[in-house]
């Protein structure tokens, strides 16, 4: 049914309007009572539970940052079967993001180009919402992805990130430090070790024991990935999230004119899968065995998720395929993982 709805209705809507419609519908699951029914249909098999970051994740599969920037649909996403929800990216101050249009589908590639620009309601508002959510026993694990406020100069980034950390860390299960979005000027430069070291050190200290992971770009050279993994180990971070969106437009099926018309931004979805898997393997080789690696990028099926777990991921996230697969995507992933693991 969803493929028909996507083909005939949603694909003809502005992508951002369609996303808003979907996220609003998901946020209404709990108060409508439909969430209880959904949970009975989507609850992950107990065998899928993962213990990491000092937490129990009911499934290794969660929602990547970007889908629920302001934590308005967390409970509904949990009721759809996602084991964790990474909200954000959130910044110290509310900001509108880049001008629209800023989200573009590449349907032939099952991909998306976005240049959202960290549009969000600010860290204080997010913290208030998460404080209320933390009282709910039926909530999923909640990570908070933090980024640099656009108007803050790169040289002032440490203070900006620390301000956000102090607001959201007390109500987060873990923090993800976003230094890899291509849509905030100067942000990716923070992945340089000389800039990254003081930033991560300050965030780690401000987080006051809340697990901290750093999210990296797929466009880094292999040696740069290794150096960041070594730094994460040196600083005692909980792990690494790999990867964010890519600037590459190589090997796309979509007509080149359509891709060019979309313009600048990060590409996510199926074309990212090969590089995301390569980066995962590098990280697993370099990081300690107990470090948490969250693999994200190009995940579509249960087999995709299992291949990331087999390659060393602790957890796996998805987002873009959610737009193409629909609301029962997490249920399909969890059911597929249970079948793969069932003794034969």
From Swiss-Prot:
CC annotations in GO: cytoplasm; plasma membrane
UniProt membrane topology term: Peripheral membrane protein
Chief location bin: membrane
Residue numbers binding substrate: 69, 114-118, 178, 183, 244-245
Catalytic reaction(s) noted: (S)-dihydroorotate + a quinone = orotate + a quinol
Cofactor note: Binds 1 FMN per subunit.
Domain of life: Bacteria
Keywords carried by this UniProt record: Cell membrane, Flavoprotein, FMN, Membrane, Oxidoreductase, Pyrimidine biosynthesis
GO molecular function annotation: dihydroorotate dehydrogenase (quinone) activity
Keyword Plastid assigned: no
EC category name: oxidoreductase
A biological process from GO: 'de novo' UMP biosynthetic process
Transmembrane segments: none
EC number: 1.3.5.2
Localization annotation: Cell membrane
Cofactor entry: FMN
Pathway membership: Pyrimidine metabolism; UMP biosynthesis via de novo pathway; orotate from (S)-dihydroorotate (quinone route): step 1/1
Similarity annotation: Belongs to the dihydroorotate dehydrogenase family. Type 2 subfamily.
Record function comment: Catalyzes the conversion of dihydroorotate to orotate with quinone as electron acceptor.
Protein name as catalogued: Dihydroorotate dehydrogenase (quinone)
Source organism of the structure: Clavibacter sepedonicus
